[in-house]
Design a protein with these regions (language model features):
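Conserved AAA+ ATPase "SRH/arginine-finger" region at the nucleotide-binding site
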Residues: 75-78, 251-262
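Conserved lysine of the Walker
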Residues: 53
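The feature marks long, low-complexity, polar/acidic/proline-rich intrinsically disordered regions embedded
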Residues: 1-39, 43, 58-70, 98-99, ...
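The conserved Walker
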Residues: 45, 49
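Short regulatory helix/loop adjacent to the ATP-binding pocket of P-loop NTPases
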Residues: 227-248
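Hydrophobic positions in the central parallel beta-sheet of the AAA+
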Residues: 43, 72, 185-187
Length: 469
């Protein structure tokens, strides 16, 4: 049984073959940008967490490799433990320098990098004062002046040495890159926004100050909002203009467009075989029931701005609960989806539902209030136009009212199929007409419905089912 998605396979010859988001065109645009830049630059590829940036970057990297570019993929988060990211970044360059003819050049790069200070300049005065606490005041001042002058000269000499080493480092690195490739070297930096603030800022500084040479193009794959939070955390102030600070390091900013929800949701539903839940062995079941479920998912994803990762999690969660129930009731996927939505975004209402704290009418009124308007848009079902949410909405009510005393759907309403005006519904909704309810009632599978607790017990088995995590 499938409960999680594997990373997309990236084919060597056709890296975007498994691209389900139609993003190859963006890779082509970005490739055209870097193809005409031999001076070196830093490009930020911005997208929200869970938007598929890493998959896109790896596909694009392979595309560039196929075009003859030398590329490096550096996961900054995985190297977060390294005190100075310069070490890891140079090591990545070394992976391209394995041939004998490059070894001397790479050795020179390492030698010069080793001379560059890896720690911040000490605060000379603080160091000296701490050293002399408790000494005679006159001697302390005298010693401080003498030692301060000596320490200052030492730091100035060190500064000159580091500046010279920095110039040599850039020259040797440029020579190595020029030997490695005639085209720009493309250096991808991924997961920067997941690093601790100190490491994230240090990576930016190293990219800008040490690797700013012709023929190297850096691609920073980031969630700009999260990276801005890291910068504020680094400086210890929410008043820092983090976006302005980032502009010092980034030459070109490219926002990865949001994916096509329709196409991606269809892919997810197909991959998780939701059609099998609706049809099973019943080939006569109306196909519109499945399309309504897809539309339900699509509307929720759109109104809550779910990321790709959240959409995956949502549908895997529905599948997990459904399969745990060990039943073939086709109304359950939509009902589970509705309950997960309520649990994730309206926890108080969800707890009232689980604990049966609401009257039938109060539950209907609360659902009317909290559900997005997009879910009440009407869509063709069989020969009728009914709201997208009609079936899960009424299913929830049926399951909610199924107790020892309310054992069947017929207890909730009485329907004369030849005359919907005789419909006797024991609740009112501002979004549904009596005819809507009659059409729902006619579609019901006859017989007793399980209790709602039968479904919610499986939902409660895992805290991982919260969509906003």
């Amino acid at each position: 049984m499938q409960y999680r998605f594997k990373d997309a396979e990236i084919g060597v010859d056709s890296p975007f073959k498994e691209d389900k988001l139609g993003r190859e065109k963006y890779a082509n645009i970005l490739t055209n940008i870097i193809a005409h830049d031999h001076e070196g630059c830093v490009i930020s590829l911005s997208g929200a967490w869970g938007a598929g940036k890493t998959t896109f970057v790896k596909m694009w990297k392979q595309m560039l490799k196929n075009k003859g570019y030398k590329t490096i993929y550096y996961n900054a988060w995985e190297s977060d433990f390294v005190e100075d990211p310069l070490v890891a970044m140079i090591a990545e360059v070394g992976e391209l320098s394995q041939e004998e003819k490059f070894k001397d050049l790479f050795a020179s790069v390492i030698a010069n990098a080793g001379k560059i200070t890896l720690a911040a300049t000490p605060k000379i005065v603080k160091h000296i004062v701490e050293k002399h606490i408790g000494s005679d005041a006159a001697d302390c001042i005298s010693d401080m002046l003498e030692e301060g002058a000596s320490a200052l000269k030492e730091q100035i000499d060190k500064y000159y040495e580091e500046r010279k080493s920095l110039t040599s480092f850039r020259a040797q690195l440029k020579g190595l890159v020029d030997q490695l490739t005639e085209q720009p070297l493309i250096f991808f930096v991924d997961e920067l926004d997941r690093c601790n603030p100190h490491h994230a800022v240090k990576v930016l500084e190293r990219v800008k100050h040490l690797f700013s040479i012709p023929n190297i193009i850096f691609i920073l794959s980031v969630d700009k909002q999260q990276l801005s939070n890291s910068i504020r955390g680094y400086f210890g102030s929410d008043r820092i203009d983090a976006e302005e600070y980032l502009r010092r390091f980034i030459d070109i900013e490219y926002f990865l467009p949001e994916p096509n929800y329709d196409y991606y949701i269809k892919y997810l539903c197909d991959d998780l075989n939701f059609k099998g839940f609706f049809f099973g062995n019943n080939s006569d079941m109306p196909s519109s029931a499945y399309s309504f479920f897809e539309e339900f998912v699509r509307s929720l994803a759109g109104c809550k701005k779910l990321t790709l990762r959240q959409m995956q999690k949502l549908l895997v969660s529905v599948r997990l609960v459904y399969c745990s129930l060990n039943t073939n009731r086709e109304e359950l996927p939509g009902l589970i989806l509705l309950l997960l939505y309520i649990r994730s975004y309206h926890l108080g209402l969800y707890e009232d539902i689980v604990n049966h704290q609401l009257t039938r009418q109060k539950l209907v009124s609360e659902l009317d209030r909290i559900l997005p308007n997009s879910l009440f848009v009407r869509k063709k079902y069989s020969e009728y136009d009914v709201p997208i949410i009609l079936f899960p909405f009424c299913d929830l009510l049926v399951y909610y009212m199924t107790t020892d005393s309310y054992s069947t759907e017929s207890k909730l309403w009485k329907v004369d199929e030849s005359d919907t005006s005789k419909l006797n519904v024991f609740f009112t909704s501002e979004h549904f007409t009596p005819e809507d309810i009659a059409r729902y009632a006619k579609s019901l599978r006859r017989g007793s419905s399980p209790r709602l607790s039968y479904v919610t017990n499986f939902i409660e088995l895992s805290e991982e089912l919260r969509l906003e995590d």
